[in-house]
Structure formats: C-alpha cells, structure tokens
Amino acid sequence: MEQKAVFDKVVKILSPYAKDKDALARVSETTNILDELKVNSARLVDVVLEFEDEFGIEIADDDVDGISTIGDCVQLISQKAA
C-alpha cells in the first residue's frame, strides 16, 4: 500500500478521536497525535486497535511507545503491512 494511502487512512481513523479539529484540518506527517490533535492518551489504545483491524496487522505495546506523530504511525503500519 502506498504511503499516501496509509496516511489518508491513519488520518481518517484518528479523526473521531481528535479534539482539535483545526489541527486536524492542517495535518501532516509531523503532526503530534497527543499534543497537537489532542487525542486522549487513554483513547490511543482504541486508535491502535482500529489500525490493527483496518490494516490487518498486530502492533506490540513496545511499538506503541514509539508513536508520537502521524508519520510514526504511517512508518510503523507500512513496515508491519509489508
């Protein structure tokens, strides 16, 4: 799957969890999920579960610790889905 397609799906999955809709409108790979989009850290588990379902992958807890930006998500998902 192309990086752009993964990026678009990641943003779509994050959309309902993002409290800052203005930041969501100008999202990029460097956008911080917790700080800029204001996704509640407790909801990050739900986001990861949706990533796993959408892309047919498994994401380990250690991998989740390395996710802070949308680009981190795209890179991790691309690696796992390859």
List the model feature ranges, each with a label.
Residues G71-K80:
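C-terminal structural segments of small proteins and small subunits
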